[in-house]
């Protein structure tokens, strides 16, 4: 029985042949996996590493330039490399788990990571999504890797040397290694993690070599342990010695499993009998097929490279945390229960970031994937009792909100099916009523929120205003899901009331959101430029706009649309001043806003990323068109410093993808995308259902960024929004672009997007 079915190469290639013909380039060739890797603790230009993987693969591989345990695994400005590491790290702030590495040396045996590290140069390094190669200058060795979802092949090319070593490092915090010399094989496991796992967590691995080695030894910490071939200790590894002639190649076929060594052996069958080059070409074809879901024409080389580098980033997380047993059954190790369970599981994702654009992009371009993710969320709830607001691989105490409600509602309302939606509704109801075992699970401060309509500033629950605003939006998404599921009127009334709780924090004096005490008075003193405190990684200027579902209601509080537009303008006008006293230091998010020179607009972090599109609600869409293009031009480039803050599991990249297409999902849970303007002359969305959305803007240029006219399927279209359901039927959108804004288009009441308050007023007439 074949367990892993791989499409014939000809079929995979067919998916992107049209793209190749129109651009004379394959999309994967435009991807720079090093984009965002020039980052450090103090300043993030993405905080990424080159993830050598297949789309949403269980394992990533990356060159390791940092010492063991350092969250900045790969830094572009580093000069030495000490291993090629299997990683599952979603963020340097979250950390890694189950990691181990392979490396090659010559001459004297060096075990310690920093001592064995070799000089390398980017001039002798190649990074593609499906392939990585580096020349290890100190050892005259070329190391290469190409992956499948759960396995990979290494190719090491050695010089002439009687002491050519292959090192397998199982890392510290508890590991195991065994050399099976007669089979040219090494097995082992790593228990290293950054929390979020059950006590019995292990990542089992198998390394199968294609030729015998002269000698094999195991080590503990930094010392060889003589006369044994099997070792379990804090930090173990294996050193395999080969006697090589110049040009000799050693292949290592590697696979891992969170279930067992036997399952790792089974996962190794993903490679089949393919050679290194065949696996590499199949990986290339898979990436080309995936990236060709969106075809773009026109634009500069940098714009094309930025677009596909960003699209690559949206196709990494959340990772598949499931495996396939010998009968073809889907199963997973539960990081919550420590048991082997049936069904899908996905992990390494922070919903505070990704509910905004990543999951809406899935609903548009990858709905069947998102249905599996929803099934995985059912499994998480069944196994842990909670939804995974930040999972890596299990629950992590990071960020705020209960934004799983948004992800669940948006998926179901946009057509995802095939999983237990009633179980997920039960889960979001539980979230709305209970605080969880971690602040990021359930709702911290929920008893105050449900009783008072806000979380008080003075009850020692940090980031109280941010939590209140996000809970109110999440309650609106629960309301929409409840309507779709025909829930009792009592529930509809409850969430209709709660979704308006944002109003309780609006300060008419400053026209900003402000922390409020339990007695109903506003916090004093109040500095709208103060980061943290009542807000999360931002200030009041950033969080005031977090009323995704009722922008008109927010505008009414500010005195109407004109005053609302003036407040939006002010974000770019006020200088990038800040108060960092809450953190007692200038955190990297503050520094990234400061150096961007866009006023107090902080695109490098998520809370304000939708703000530009709110001009459409104020009947001034041309300002959105200006600032969206400005942000794409200034905050992104396809280089190691290519982002303006943390990339965050695809979120900052997904903003660029949507914005380049010409619209953005301001309010997941609604049916509407809000218009910006397309970046390219032509964009084709190849929808999963076989339909196409063709977006044409033939006059598009650096100067012509403003929409003059627009047609939808050949008919004049003046609205500032597009319907998801209409796009899913296939559509042609044609934009006439110009150098000056058209201040008449998109200004009528019927042109403005959905807001909860508008609908309520219409219902009450």
Residue ranges of predicted features:
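Bacterial Sec-dependent N-terminal signal peptides
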Residues: 1-23, 765
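Extracellular attachment/recognition segments
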Residues: 706
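ATP-dependent phospho-/nucleotidyl transfer catalytic cores
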Residues: 474
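Accessory carbohydrate-recognition regions in carbohydrate-active enzymes
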Residues: 21-359, 363-406, 412-469, 477, ...
């Amino acid at each position: 029985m074949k367990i892993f079915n791989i499409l014939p190469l000809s079929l995979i290639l067919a998916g992107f042949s049209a793209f190749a013909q129109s651009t004379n380039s394959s999309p994967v060739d435009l991807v720079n996996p090093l984009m965002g890797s020039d980052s450090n603790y103090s300043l993030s230009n993405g905080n990424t590493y080159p993830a050598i993987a297949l789309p949403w693969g269980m394992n990533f591989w990356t060159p390791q330039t940092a010492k063991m345990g350092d969250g900045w695994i790969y830094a572009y400005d580093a000069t030495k490399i000490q291993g090629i590491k299997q990683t599952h790290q979603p963020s340097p702030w979250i950390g890694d788990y189950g990691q181990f590495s392979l490396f090659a040396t010559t001459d004297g045996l060096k075990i310690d990571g920093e001592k064995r590290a070799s000089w390398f140069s980017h001039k002798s390094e190649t990074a593609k999504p499906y392939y990585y190669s580096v020349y290890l200058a100190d050892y005259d060795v070329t190391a290469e890797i190409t992956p499948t979802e759960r396995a990979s092949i290494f190719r090491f090319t050695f010089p002439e040397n009687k002491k050519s070593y292959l090192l397998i490092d199982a890392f510290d915090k508890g590991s195991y290694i065994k050399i099976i010399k007669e089979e040219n094989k090494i097995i082992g496991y790593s228990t290293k993690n950054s929390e979020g796992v059950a006590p019995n967590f292990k990542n089992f691995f198998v390394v199968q070599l294609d030729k015998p080695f002269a000698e094999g030894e195991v080590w503990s910490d930094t010392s060889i342990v003589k006369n044994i071939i099997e070792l379990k200790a804090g930090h173990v590894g294996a050193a395999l010695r080969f006697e090589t002639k110049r040009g000799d190649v050693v292949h290592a076929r590697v696979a891992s499993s969170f279930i067992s060594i036997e399952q790792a052996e089974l996962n190794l069958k993903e490679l089949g009998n393919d050679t290194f080059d065949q696996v590499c070409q199949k990986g290339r074809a898979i990436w080309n097929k995936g990236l060709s879901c969106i075809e773009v024409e026109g634009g500069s080389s940098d714009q094309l490279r930025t677009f596909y580098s960003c699209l690559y980033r949206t196709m990494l997380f959340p990772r598949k945390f499931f495996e396939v047993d010998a009968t073809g059954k889907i199963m997973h190790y539960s990081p919550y229960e420590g048991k082997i369970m049936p069904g899908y599981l996905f992990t390494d994702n922070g919903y505070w970031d990704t509910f905004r654009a990543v999951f809406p992009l899935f609903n548009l371009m990858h709905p069947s994937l998102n249905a599996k993710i929803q099934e995985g969320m059912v499994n998480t709830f069944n196994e842990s009792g909670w939804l995974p607001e930040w999972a890596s691989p299990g629950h992590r105490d990071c960020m705020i909100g209960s934004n799983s409600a948004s992800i669940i509602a948006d998926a179901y309302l946009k057509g995802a099916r095939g999983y237990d939606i009633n179980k997920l509704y039960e889960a979001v109801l539980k979230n709305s009523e209970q605080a969880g075992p971690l602040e990021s699970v359930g709702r911290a401060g929920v008893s105050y929120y449900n009783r008072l309509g806000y979380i008080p500033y003075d009850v020692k629950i940090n980031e109280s205003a941010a939590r209140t605003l996000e809970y109110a939006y999440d309650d609106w998404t629960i309301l929409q899901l409840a309507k779709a599921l025909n829930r009792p009127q009592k529930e509809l009334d409850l969430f209709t009331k709660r979704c308006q709780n944002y109003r309780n924090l609006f300060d008419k004096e400053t026209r900003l959101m402000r922390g409020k005490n339990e007695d109903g008075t506003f916090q004093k003193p109040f500095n709208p430029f103060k980061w943290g405190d009542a807000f999360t990684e931002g200030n009041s200027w950033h969080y005031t706009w977090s009323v995704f579902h009722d922008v008109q209601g927010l505008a009414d509080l500010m005195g109407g649309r004109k005053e609302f537009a003036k407040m939006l303008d002010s974000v770019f006008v006020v200088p990038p001043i800040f108060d960092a006293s809450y953190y007692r230091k200038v955190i990297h998010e503050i520094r990234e806003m400061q150096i961007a020179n866009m006023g107090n607009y902080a695109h490098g972090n998520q809370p304000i990323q939708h703000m530009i599109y709110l001009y459409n609600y104020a009947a001034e869409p041309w300002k959105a068109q200006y600032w969206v293009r400005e942000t794409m031009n200034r905050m992104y480039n396809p280089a190691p410093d290519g982002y303006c803050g943390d990339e965050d599991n695809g979120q900052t990249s997904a903003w660029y993808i949507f914005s380049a297409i010409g619209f953005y999902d301001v309010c997941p849970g609604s049916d509407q995308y809000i218009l910006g303007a397309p970046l390219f002359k032509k964009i084709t969305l190849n929808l999963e259902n076989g339909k196409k959305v063709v977006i044409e803007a033939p006059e598009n240029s650096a100067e012509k960024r403003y929409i003059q006219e627009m047609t939808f399927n050949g008919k004049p279209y003046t609205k500032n929004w597009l319907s998801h359901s209409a796009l899913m039927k296939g559509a042609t959108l044609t934009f006439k672009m110009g150098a000056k804004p058209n201040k008449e288009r998109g200004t009528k009441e019927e042109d403005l997007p959905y807001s909860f308050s508008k609908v309520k007023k219409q219902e009450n007439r």
